[in-house]
Amino acid sequence: MSTIEERVKKIIGEQLGVKQEEVTNNASFVEDLGADSLDTVELVMALEEEFDTEIPDEEAEKITTVQAAIDYINGHQA
């Protein structure tokens, strides 16, 4: 099975339509990967589905980079 980091990066690449090598840990969804607000909402929904978790809106607003998404999922896995 893939690591959480690999799974998060794969989802981000697929959701934002960017090459996997562009999805670096310190990449910002908006500034580096070209996401808009709708993209980020869809990304959070995809992460929730993949990891069977719920990300509250106030937490989702803080997830603005690849590393932040990885850290959140790592911290909230059952």
Curated annotation (Swiss-Prot):
Instruction: Report the PROSITE patterns cross-referenced here.
Output: CARRIER, PHOSPHOPANTETHEINE
| Annotated positions of the O-(pantetheine 4'-phosphoryl)serine modification | S37
Q: Which Gene3D superfamilies match?
A: ACP-like (1.10.1200.10)
Q: How is it modified after translation?
A: 4'-phosphopantetheine is transferred from CoA to a specific serine of apo-ACP by AcpS. This modification is essential for activity because fatty acids are bound in thioester linkage to the sulfhydryl of the prosthetic group.
- What keywords does the record list, in alphabetical order? Cytoplasm, Fatty acid biosynthesis, Fatty acid metabolism, Lipid biosynthesis, Lipid metabolism, Phosphopantetheine, Phosphoprotein
Carrier domain residues: 2-77
Localization of this protein: Cytoplasm
Q: Which GO terms describe its molecular function?
A: acyl binding; acyl carrier activity; lipid binding; phosphopantetheine binding
InterPro entries recorded:
ACP, ACP-like_sf, PP-bd_ACP, Ppantetheine_attach_site
Cellular component GO terms held in the UniProt record: cytoplasm; cytosol; membrane
- GO BP term, example: response to xenobiotic stimulus
Pathway(s) per entry? Lipid metabolism; fatty acid biosynthesis
Identify one Pfam family in the record: PP-binding
**Which NCBIfam families did the record assign?**
acyl_carrier, PRK00982.1-2, PRK00982.1-3, PRK00982.1-4, PRK00982.1-5
What the protein does comes down to: Carrier of the growing fatty acid chain in fatty acid biosynthesis.
Self-association and partners: Interacts with MukB.
Give the family, as the similarity comment puts it. Answer: Belongs to the acyl carrier protein (ACP) family.
Designated name of the protein: Acyl carrier protein
Q: List the source organism.
A: Escherichia coli (strain K12)
The organism's lineage is: Bacteria, Pseudomonadati, Pseudomonadota, Gammaproteobacteria, Enterobacterales
